[in-house]
Amino acid sequence: MNLFADFENRIKTALETLDLVKEKRSELSFDRIVVEPPRDASHGDAATNAAMVLAKPLGVSPRVLADLIGEKLKEDADIAEVSVAGPGFLNIRLSVAYWQRLLANVIAGGTDFGRSQTGAGRKVNVEYVSANPTGPMHVGHCRGAVVGDALANLLAFAGYGVTKEYYINDAGSQIDVLARSVFLRYREALGEAVGEIPAGLYPGDYLIPVGEALAQEYGVRLHNMPEEQWMEIVKDRAIDAMMVMIREDLAALNVHHDLFYSERQLHANGAAAIRTAINDLTFKGHVYRGTLPPPKGQLPEDWEDREQTLFRSTEVGDDIDRPLIKSDGSYTYFAADVAYFKDKYDRGFDRMIYVLGADHGGYVKRLEAVAKAVSEGKAKLTVLLCQLVKLYRDGEPVKMSKRSGDFVTLRDVVEEVGRDSVRFMMLYRKSSEPLDFDFAKVTEQSKDNPVFYVQYAHARCMSIFRQAREAFGDIDLSPDVLEAAVTGITEPSEVQLIAKLAEYPRIIEASAQSMEPHRIAFYLYDLASSFHAHWNKGKDQPELRFVNDKNRQSSLARLGLVHAVASVLQSGLAITGTDAPQEMR
């Protein structure tokens, strides 16, 4: 049950009964009417702009219209009070009986409360991480991995048919460098003194086992092959080994993709997929032969002062036209991007989300141009950019040199502070804003550590259930029993907690629509704060305690509230990819 959608419908129904609305109904649009929590909770439980939106087309003042709407709403038994504020906003306070029914609805829904059908099963492809398969995941990949994964979880909960995809960049020049780096480690494993790793190769020790495995399997045979022969063998083995490492790193972060798509598929069979994509754009009039003027600043690697085959991307929103085929007949990296988008579109995705690092900001317009051209405007592409993560320890910048290279790996961070801390904190700021990650703060057991505070709220719920079983022994805490007891909830602070629970469906829909999974983390912290605050009131006010061993029925009512809080916490934590613990250790 979405409280705000429910009362938006009730307000629209009330409007339909007003004579002045009936007279001009064909001229009116209710689309801009919004019902939301008031900025100040003391003003009521819901607020609407209905009178402000419709006053001008109806030719009356907002306050007059608000009074008319308010009189109609007062006929609703679920509304305890209606008041007009400011220039014509309506504040609504709901009856205790309504809150009791809503609580019963949360209990019945369990962890499915808030699940939405907004997506209506529409297919969405979320591509994230897509790190080059040249080494272990570093902390720079971490934020995009978490944001992409949580966004995919959120969209699935909102009713979309989501595919989590990883694009393996295994066809570029970096793979040649990887193969040569591994071949050096292979020679080293055969006993050759290779000395210092040459500049331009990957120096990390993580390549040593790959070289050793090749030496064990092939002996000196690879060494005796011409480069064009051993290169393909080493490429295959190196990519496979790197992807095993990357999958393990992602699994440590509880990130699991549905599909790993190899760029080499696009280059197979004489690059048939790329050729087909370019032919398709040519047929649609988006391709021409020409020479690009030199761009200002540093020249991109695909620019050359010769005639090339170009994508007319400026006609579909890009800043410059983009090369597809170089003067020597080879395809550009961008040509593969076009083919990859077309492949997704041909797989039935008309909604695609790319989660990229902030350093890929220059790709946004060209990808959007590809989407418009390939799909003829039928597909929607969204690029989310994740800003940098800076590591600190007790406020001091972290500088760490690891055996895997001169960077902090994702695994380093997860092993030090735990998967849940990493995931939740990566979401505890909007992805477009830089994030400071302090190792000391994310392991504190205090209100200042959001992941601890939220998980502690769930663990506290579980502790209350254990306390109830100790107090009453055979007490039945099944949802049916707890639903039936909700009429015992009457205290204002209890109603405030239900009101916070009632926001969850709206948060889900709004977060999915704006593609902002961080809003789930913020909401969970607010809910945990409300729950902890209510629990603390029980210290001084025994009548508010969740378990009263002298009153089984009132305890059941409050245990229903605990069940509802635990369910929503568990649901939200699942979206963030974080555990809901039974107890804190």
Swiss-Prot record:
It holds the Pfam family DALR_1. CDD domains: ArgRS_core. Keywords: Aminoacyl-tRNA synthetase, ATP-binding, Cytoplasm, Ligase, Nucleotide-binding, Protein biosynthesis. Its EC number is 6.1.1.19. The keyword Chloroplast does not apply. Monomer. This is Arginine--tRNA ligase. It comes from Allorhizobium ampelinum (strain ATCC BAA-846 / DSM 112012 / S4). The lineage of its organism: Bacteria, Pseudomonadati, Pseudomonadota, Alphaproteobacteria, Hyphomicrobiales. The gene is argS.
